[in-house]
């Protein structure tokens, strides 16, 4: 019945028409009229009886004034014999149809002016008489023949009926539109006669508007002319809805009155049964109990303790993991205790700061289930006083607040900021646990995301659920909620809060929070258009959201209707007030008053000219681009998700595809996408972006002067970094080192390097002289040998082959922007922005360049301009490349880590070549997909940059893969490794790399790029030339240019991937049949000839143990650290466990925890000895 009351659906009519057309083509006699014998064709609607009328055309009016068509043959003339036969027949037989008396088939009565449909319905007596006559006169064959004739005629009748109906509707629409247009014209004539002056003025304004916006004006005129049709459609829709509601109301009233007797009878039976039970119960003697209320509570409490908790959650200590704790109190007023009705401990909750200044309490749902009271430092409140603001049942997460005035003061809470899931990184966090009335802090390590939550290495006990995980700023980043099932993961788990707009995250775009995290650190990444993971429902106050969570991605939240989802969980249990559908259901029945939020203002200062070392880029309101929203709507259009095109002088529409020589300068016109989008062209001598215009006079060039072998001093720049005092042991480290021979040996073996321009220049001179000496005798392999090695390497990396990025085919603006934002999201936020961008005041790190939309747009302009410069121009020399805007100088500095004393004495410090943020993004756009695919496929290719040894199963998987290459078992490989492999390590590899090896690596990359466009190949080749022969910038601003190409830049985006592949190619040159590599480390087959490395100018040595990546293999799944003394020396430096600052103490504890994880397979006596020598036995549990 419910479906009957719905509005009429047009699908049935279309289905009938489709069936009619099908019959029309399947049955040859459809639409044609047979003669009375059933075999001949009837005369058509024409003067000649021999004519045949087509069923596809509409019938023409006949010459007679009125022509009644009794059948579907549309015959206008009948013979006298037909008339006589019709009168003699006992039936009213028209055409070849047999109709009984009183029956008349639907007939069209046509005249020259109109056509009418005549339908005559018989009475019941006639129907009965005709039915009896049919049974008497007709046999089965006759009935089948008549039915077949009826089916044959039906399609033609349907088509004619539909055609006439369409004609009538068209005439009606024509009449309405003509009448409406005449009325509009009469109004215009009246206005012209009444006020001719204003009429002329209005006409002039209309003509101007039509000239300025012709499309919009014409659209408005069309809407005015067709207003009656729109009104008719609205009234039609409204009328159908009204009729539907009336029918539904009538049906409900009918059902109510019809079922009333039965409902009354059932209620009377229930009353009788209840009365009989009461009478029976009153006749029994009443029991008397001598137990007091106190005794009852005692018994019920004992029963509850015996039964245990309603929602038990297992806690776990990971076997083999030694977790140390420091005696430390947590931040006051943050951790709250949850108890049941008897005061017994259930779990914990955390006071957090939400958006708009609101205070909330976050806790697991299973803790909320057993909690009756929430206890704070000052007092306690009942759980019934709190209402739900956020709930995700899949993650067992809940956020509550209270409408009670001053509830925070009653509990004594001091809330801390709450971060969302996209800010959680894979690192150590502070976890405070209470043991015997004392609080301890431990380094809980978040090692991996899983099922929308996190795998956390921590030591917990039953009752610890709800404890927060703090970062270094004491912000709440996650909440502990027990352990994983034993068959899933051995670690504990924690959940984080999803970014809900105006509740747990701001509704305005956040750039630093979602754009600058490293791909190796961030656990989950917010992504748009992602739906491959598990669907998660987030219920909040008055609104419901949904998202999808994959292995490491979280889809942007989308709004969802708050319907049946409220049937489960705390919010569903609190649904007491069903009338108030504007707020979330709650337990206490009290409404929550929202807190008003303030507005923030942004600076609009323009960019200054000149060096710009004390200014920041401007933020223009006119620019539009893509932000990183915290949520999205499902109904959002494509334009709302894509950045809008920017209008600037550097872009022009052009479809040319050739290279032209204009006044001796090469200018390449970028092909457009063919869809009206803009392509960009940059002039080599005129700054086209705001950022490049600032640095127009930033560099002071001078005549080249040799400063080191292979390096010339070519100028300077205002960028300077003050020399920091040398780092050394802390006072605590010096004290404990004097009391231990082991620690004293560590301090004698390692030390901290010098920093500053002098240290950088001295180390540069050492490395340059060493490189020049090696390259003097080095040889370059023949071309055919190089090509053969390129083919072999390409086959080894064949599984990482990917199509070329889409933006490189047509340089479409939207595709380039999308790739740019993907690259920005993978930047390391705290990494230096490089030269010259770090010269801005307050812009020394990457995250300061993408902190809002305007600054990111300025960066996008610069990256886009540089890409097209790489495409349009050629590399001449390093200085000219900087002048032409092809590349930025590379910042050179000493890596701040412990060095061996031998390197300290020789001033052979490890140098880091830091690439600027623009060049970093350019490299990511050129090679991002390829490098990410290598990380995913590291177990299937020789390069192992994605490998880790922090877990035993990772070690075992690597050992088994190497054993498969060597043709033996993992255990045999470890026991007899010298028979199967050769561990090698290259000294000073980055500074020894020749240019031809970098070119061969690029050749392999191009071979692995399917459908490589010419433009992408050109940009990659120019990029490599700029990288291979660069300008270095020291800490004092001195600029040094390479005179000979080569040297791998350690801070480049491709360093890890390229070094690993070049290391594999070198192993092939040395004669190895197989090799696995990571950076400059390699495991090669026993047939490798290490003397070939020296011929190529690279120093390579064989290790004395089964060593790979500073780890020594002791079993197929057991490795121990090789540089333990270096790690311990770092523990004695910097921060200490005696620091007055909590952040310093936790930093030291995290370092200790990392060392203990590396030492997890070392003898326990050695670990205890280390703790004893450090003298922290009384501080560390």
UniProtKB/Swiss-Prot annotation:
Lineage: Viruses, Riboviria, Orthornavirae, Pisuviricota, Pisoniviricetes
Protein name in the entry: Protein P1-P2
Residues that span the membrane, as ranges: 172-192, 194-214, 218-235, 240-260
Protein family per UniProt: Belongs to the luteoviruses RNA polymerase family.
Bias (Polar residues): 649-677
Cited InterPro entries: DNA/RNA_pol_sf, Peptidase_S39B_luteovirus, RNA-dir_pol_luteovirus, RNA-dir_pol_PSvirus
Species name: Pea enation mosaic virus-1 (strain WSG)
Function as written in the Swiss-Prot or TrEMBL entry: RNA-dependent RNA polymerase that plays an essential role in virus replication.
Pfam families: Peptidase_S39, RdRP_4
Cellular-component GO terms for this entry: membrane
Superkingdom per UniProt: Viruses
UniProt region (Disordered), positions on chain: 572-688
């Amino acid at each position: 019945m419910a479906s009957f009351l719905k509005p009429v659906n047009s699908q049935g009519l279309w289905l009938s028409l489709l069936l009619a057309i099908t019959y029309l083509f399947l049955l040859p006699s459809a639409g044609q009229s047979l003669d009375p014998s059933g075999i001949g064709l009837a005369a058509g609607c024409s003067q000649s009886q021999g004519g045949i009328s087509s069923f596809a055309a509409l019938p023409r009016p006949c010459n007679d004034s009125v022509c009644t068509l009794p059948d579907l043959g549309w015959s206008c003339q009948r013979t006298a014999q037909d008339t006589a036969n019709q009168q003699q027949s006992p039936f009213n037989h028209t055409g070849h149809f047999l109709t009984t008396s009183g029956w008349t088939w639907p007939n069209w009565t046509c005249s020259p002016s109109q056509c009418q449909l005549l339908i005559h319905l018989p009475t019941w007596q006639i129907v009965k008489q005709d039915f009896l006559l049919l049974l008497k006169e007709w046999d089965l064959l006759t009935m089948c023949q008549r039915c077949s004739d009826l089916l044959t005629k039906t399609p033609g009748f349907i088509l004619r009926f539909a055609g006439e109906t369409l004609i009538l509707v068209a005439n009606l629409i024509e009449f309405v539109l003509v009448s409406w247009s005449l009325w509009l014209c009469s109004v215009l004539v009246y206005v012209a006669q009444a006020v001719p002056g204003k009429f002329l003025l209005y006409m002039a304004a209309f003509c101007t508007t039509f000239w300025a916006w012709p499309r919009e004006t014409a659209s408005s005129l069309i809407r005015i002319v067709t207003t009656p049709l729109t009104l008719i459609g609205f009234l039609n829709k409204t009328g159908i809805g009204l009729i539907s509601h009336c029918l539904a109301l009538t049906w409900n009233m009918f059902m109510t009155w019809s079922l009333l007797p039965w409902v009354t009878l059932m209620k009377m039976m229930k009353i009788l049964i209840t009365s009989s039970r009461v009478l029976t119960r009153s006749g029994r003697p009443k029991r008397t109990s001598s137990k007091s209320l106190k005794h009852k509570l005692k018994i019920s409490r004992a029963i509850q303790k015996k039964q245990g908790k309603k929602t038990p959650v297992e806690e776990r200590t990971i076997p083999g993991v030694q977790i140390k704790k420091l005696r430390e109190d947590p931040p006051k007023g943050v951790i709250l205790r949850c108890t049941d009705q008897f005061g017994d401990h259930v779990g914990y909750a955390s006071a957090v700061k939400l958006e708009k200044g609101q205070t909330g309490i976050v806790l697991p749902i299973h803790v909320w289930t057993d909690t009756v009271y929430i206890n704070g430092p000052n007092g306690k409140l009942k759980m019934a006083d709190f209402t739900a603001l956020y709930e995700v049942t899949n993650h067992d997460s809940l956020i509550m607040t209270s409408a009670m005035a001053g509830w925070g003061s009653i509990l004594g809470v001091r809330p801390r900021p709450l971060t969302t899931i996209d800010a959680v990184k894979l690192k150590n966090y502070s976890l405070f646990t209470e043991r015997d009335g004392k609080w301890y802090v431990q380094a809980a390590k978040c090692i991996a995301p899983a099922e929308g939550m996190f795998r956390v290495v921590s030591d917990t006990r039953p009752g610890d659920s709800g404890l927060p995980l703090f970062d270094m700023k004491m912000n709440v980043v996650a909440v502990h909620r027990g352990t994983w099932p034993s068959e899933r993961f051995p670690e504990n788990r924690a959940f984080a809060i999803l970014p809900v707009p105006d509740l747990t995250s701001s509704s305005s775009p956040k750039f630093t929070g979602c754009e600058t995290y490293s791909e190796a650190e961030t656990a989950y990444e917010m992504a748009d258009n992602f739906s491959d993971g598990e669907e998660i429902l987030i219920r909040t106050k008055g609104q419901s959201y949904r998202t999808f969570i994959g292995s490491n991605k979280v889809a942007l939240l989308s709004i969802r209707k708050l319907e049946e989802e409220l049937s489960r969980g705390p919010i569903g249990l609190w649904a007491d007030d069903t009338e108030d559908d504007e707020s979330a259901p709650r337990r206490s029945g009290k409404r929550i008053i929202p807190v008003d939020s303030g507005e923030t203002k942004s600076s609009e200062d323009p960019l200054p000219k000149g060096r710009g070392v004390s200014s920041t880029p401007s933020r223009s309101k006119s620019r539009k681009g893509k932000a990183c929203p915290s949520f999205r709507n499902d109904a959002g259009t494509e334009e709302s998700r894509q950045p809008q095109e920017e209008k600037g002088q550097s872009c022009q529409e052009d479809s040319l595809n050739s290279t032209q020589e204009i006044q001796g300068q090469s200018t390449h016109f970028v092909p457009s996408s063919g869809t009206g989008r803009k392509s960009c062209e940059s002039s080599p001598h005129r700054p086209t972006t705001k950022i490049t215009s600032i640095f127009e006079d930033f560099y002071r060039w001078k005549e080249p002067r040799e400063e080191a072998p292979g390096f010339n001093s070519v100028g300077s720049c205002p960028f300077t970094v003050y020399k920091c005092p040398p780092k050394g042991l802390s006072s605590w480290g010096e004290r404990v080192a004097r009391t231990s021979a082991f620690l004293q040996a560590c301090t004698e073996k390692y030390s901290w390097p010098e920093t500053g321009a002098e240290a950088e220049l001295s180390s540069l001179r050492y490395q340059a002289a060493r490189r020049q000496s090696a390259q003097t005798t080095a040889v370059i392999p023949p071309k055919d040998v190089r090509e053969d090695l390129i083919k072999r390497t390409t086959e080894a990396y064949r599984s990482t082959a990917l199509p070329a990025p889409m933006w490189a085919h047509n340089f479409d603006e939207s595709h380039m922007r999308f790739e740019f934002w993907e690259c920005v999201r993978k930047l390391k936020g705290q990494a230096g922005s490089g030269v010259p961008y770090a010269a801005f005041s307050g812009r020394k790190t990457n995250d300061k360049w993408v902190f809002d939309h305007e600054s990111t747009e300025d960066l996008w302009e610069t990256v886009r301009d540089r890409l097209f410069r790489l495409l349009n121009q050629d590399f001449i020399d390093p200085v000219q490349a900087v002048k032409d805007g092809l590349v930025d100088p590379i910042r050179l500095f000493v890596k701040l880590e412990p060095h061996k004393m031998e390197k300290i004495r020789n001033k052979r410090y490890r140098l880091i070549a830091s690439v600027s943020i623009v060049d970093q993004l350019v490299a990511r756009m050129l090679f991002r997909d390829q490098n990410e695919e290598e990380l995913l496929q590291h177990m299937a290719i020789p390069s192992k940059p994605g490998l880790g040894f922090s877990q035993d199963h990772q070690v075992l998987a690597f050992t088994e893969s190497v054993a498969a290459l060597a043709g033996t078992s993992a255990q045999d490989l470890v026991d007899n490794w010298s028979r199967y492999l050769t561990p090698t390590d290259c000294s000073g590899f980055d500074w020894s790399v020749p240019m031809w090896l970098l070119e061969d690596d690029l050749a392999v990359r191009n071979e692995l790029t399917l459908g490589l466009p010419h433009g992408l190949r050109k940009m990659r080749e120019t990029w490599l030339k700029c990288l291979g022969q660069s300008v270095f910038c020291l800490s004092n601003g001195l600029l040094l240019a390479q005179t000979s190409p080569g040297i791998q830049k350690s801070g480049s985006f491709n360093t890890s991937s390229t070094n690993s592949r070049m290391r594999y190619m070198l192993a092939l040159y040395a004669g190895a049949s197989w090799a696995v590599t990571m950076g400059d480390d390699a495991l090669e087959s026993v047939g490798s000839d290490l003397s070939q490395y020296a011929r190529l100018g690279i120093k390579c040595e064989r290790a004395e143990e089964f060593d790979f990546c500073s780890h020594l293999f002791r079993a197929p799944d057991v490795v121990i650290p090789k540089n333990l003394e270096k790690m311990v020396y770092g523990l004695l430096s910097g921060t200490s466990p005696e620091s007055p600052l909590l952040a310093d103490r936790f930093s030291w504890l995290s370092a200790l925890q990392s060392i203990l994880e590396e030492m997890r397979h070392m003898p326990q006596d050695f670990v205890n000895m280390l703790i004893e020598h450090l003298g922290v036995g009384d501080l560390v549990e």
